């Protein structure tokens, strides 16, 4: 019952979208999208009921399937270690609802590639930016939500005695190689020194010392971190968000706008949440929308753990 916007009513040159772009006609995923759209509209569980009864509809790599946890894990490892993925990073991606699940999947995949005891970063690591970092001339070094491959890496101790890695990243969007910047080795004891300096500079700024915030951000933006951490300030606990992370898995929210050939979905993480009272279902409206976004990222196929 909305009124038609004049923008669409009187404009001469306009485009009407009538064709499916991501998935080819006949892809079984299209039927799932239809079920989910109805579920979103009516707050129902038709999609979940359907896939429980029809656990697989895939042929020639097109469609969907639900597989057990052990098989799901091995499938992820196989896909990310395949020649196909190395030639095309949009071949495969994992998505989940919570940051914890994303972190867990990233660890499983990366450990299978470089081993559990490897440094926090490694040549050819796939990383995803969680922040836009600019240089002193306000030119972006890395862009939020962009994929990068670790092109070059050199161990480096900063003037403050912080163990870091001096790295160059290659953008998977345009092939641009970034200027060198520093990633803090969060496994090293000197990470505590980094946090101490950051806390000190934050407190100076909070106390309104002249140019305090400028100094704080100048220091902070010299270093990138790959995990979220807290510092204890005069204003209480402050959480510092990570700048980058491994890019094999990402939250459903982070995938919006992206398309991958094949997507692995931790459906259990979307449908349920763990509480102190046990496992409970997430809000039906939220989970239906999340499931729709997650499934619709795939061009060819989806595998689900549920």
Stretches with model-predicted labels:
Residues 163-306:
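C-terminal accessory regions
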Residues 1-144, 149-204:
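Conserved helicase motor core of P-loop NTPases
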